[in-house]
């Protein structure tokens, strides 16, 4: 690695964003006659998919409130569909199943999906929603549901396998992916432009840098000597709020229920769509019947043969610490601080049982 001293493009991070950028940049350079993938290197302090991309649930959907995000995700879904095998992509669809308080917002998403020709079906009303779900799952029993948005496209990808597939496509284009290289800083020229990336194995001179380190973005931000606080303008009132912390960490709660993934097959024996339920119905423990919450709650889930079970999660929560005090390393399941506890397990499995009877009694 110490022999690599220069590359026109350096991408920091071998997760979904870094690898996707490398792959598409290589294709674009070639198409424009401005270079090839050989002009790009991806460096990662560990290995491909060692951050969030390697452990995430891998859901691929178009269910976003922002119109720009919907158009971007429609484009992304089309890319996944180009090679499902290489990307380990399962095009099973996605379902947003909601209570009345979300009805208007979900209807808006449906209308905007129609505007960009993204195929989906929208079901309204308690009875029609219940019948629709029973046609898919004979044991469906979630209460208080008044809208179902069923996206025909989308689904999920097996995290590690999809990243390996994406990396292989980038490498076919000539991109070099180098593991075990830690960024320690950036060097600038007299105009303040980044001229090289400093690493633990030597400096690499470059023309362009793409920073895609996922949860380690703050560390890169600090190396670039960017501000700790920012000012944000309210688009409706015009009021500018000062000294807002640039970084606030959220902890995503996800896990896997250790059952046969085929337990979640549909009535016709097929693999099911990804299920996302948001409801304000009271949630009771499947273990002892005690009340877990009488406020709004939500979960998402799907079968996963990589982890061997039913994988999914619930709403993330804000990490109640200053950003400088949050220990990102060790990351993921190796972290003693950010692994889910029994409270999440009880809530999530009870929520599964609330939605489908087949999950009742599966709590260890």
Segments predicted by a language model, with ranges:
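Core beta-strand elements of the Rossmann-like FAD/NAD(P) dinucleotide-binding domain
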Residues: 4-7, 198-208
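N-terminal Rossmann-like FAD-binding beta1-loop-alpha1 element of flavoenzymes
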Residues: 7-41
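Conserved Rossmann-like nucleotide-cofactor binding loop
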Residues: 17, 21, 48, 216
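Short, well-ordered alpha-helices that flank and scaffold nucleotide-derived cofactor binding pockets
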Residues: 23, 27-31, 168, 172, ...
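Conserved FAD-binding subdomain of flavin-dependent enzymes
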Residues: 24-31, 39, 45-120
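Flavin (FAD/FMN) cofactor-binding and adjacent substrate-gating region
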Residues: 81-82, 101-179, 184-193, 198
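Central helical "cap/lid" subdomain
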Residues: 203-291
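Active-site lid/adjacent beta-loop-alpha segment flanking the redox-cofactor pocket in flavoenzymes
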Residues: 255-364
